């Protein structure tokens, strides 16, 4: 399975094409719209979320509520485009109109300046439009399709925020994936500890008043993943490496860890390695899950625990200093519409890219033309692993 996305932040629409989805997968536009709605939620979101109510149009690859095995095309209209018809026009326009929303004061921490250097733009809006997090709309749409595949295979996925701008959120021990999903869904800030809810919301309000932004750490957990996805035989076959690339490809994400992650550098081997157990009922399990469900670049049957760190959003309402690319004189950076934080929304994006990567890996290992073949192949593999 593979996909491409296209579209600009203020262009007419966003598009994704997905290839390799088996025939027979139940899929409706509403399945995708539910995920798009989640992405637009969360405390601290800006005015763009009031303008856009994202809804997908499926224009290929689905008939009578099921996938056909052909490429799937997804489109989401940008309602805000009506205010940008001249600025984002495909055809050439007058120079006076071109300069109307030209960006020449790049924002520190954004793709503006380096994108202009790379592609030789004199208007940095070209960098901004495609590098905008608006693109993640389609990654969530693609992820919604991937989640339907995972659900058919009894694989469940959830995310929650564990660090909010330096404030660590205590997570109760022993929560299942379903419990994490339920608790995070009930929280406006996607945390599982409801006692911290009002504190975090007040903190976001203060950051907004300060004209600043905050980042944090998001944890995605996946249950029901069969052992043996990924491989140790080549560096680019390791599934944890593929997931790391997928997570860090999300706008503003700067790092990823699995299980205890970077804490492993402070612990002894006897404190980190997960002892192997076996029972007639469950087959092979681990006493702990410090490695986050991975050994040798492969899934080991335990829940996957993946954390991604998101830097603060680079657009500040009290902008940092930059340089005018025409005069090279010091100048305050451009201010575009932004949020004090997008952690809850980013969690949905992270969940989506993890789901897409896992679905792709499953279809690589259990190559199938239709869902019945896929479900039978995965069930057979699970039985084999349990009785190994």
Swiss-Prot record:
Its cofactor is FMNH2. Its EC number is 4.2.3.5. Disulfide bonds: none annotated. Reduced FMN (FMNH(2)). NADP(+) binds at residues 39, 45. GO terms for biological process: amino acid biosynthetic process; aromatic amino acid family biosynthetic process; chorismate biosynthetic process. It holds the Pfam family Chorismate_synt. FMN binds at residues 130-132, 251-252, 296, 311-315, 337. Keywords: Amino-acid biosynthesis, Aromatic amino acid biosynthesis, FAD, Flavoprotein, FMN, Lyase, NADP. GO terms for molecular function: chorismate synthase activity; FMN binding. It catalyses: 5-O-(1-carboxyvinyl)-3-phosphoshikimate = chorismate + phosphate. The keyword NADP applies. One of its GO terms (cellular component) is cytosol. The keyword Amino-acid biosynthesis applies. InterPro entries: Chorismate_synth (IPR000453), Chorismate_synth_AroC_sf (IPR035904), Chorismate_synthase_CS (IPR020541). PROSITE patterns: CHORISMATE_SYNTHASE_1, CHORISMATE_SYNTHASE_2, CHORISMATE_SYNTHASE_3. Pathway: Metabolic intermediate biosynthesis; chorismate biosynthesis; chorismate from D-erythrose 4-phosphate and phosphoenolpyruvate: step 7/7. It comes from the Bacteria. This reaction introduces a second double bond into the aromatic ring system. Belongs to the chorismate synthase family. Homotetramer. HAMAP family: Chorismate_synth. This is Chorismate synthase. It comes from Streptococcus suis (strain 05ZYH33).
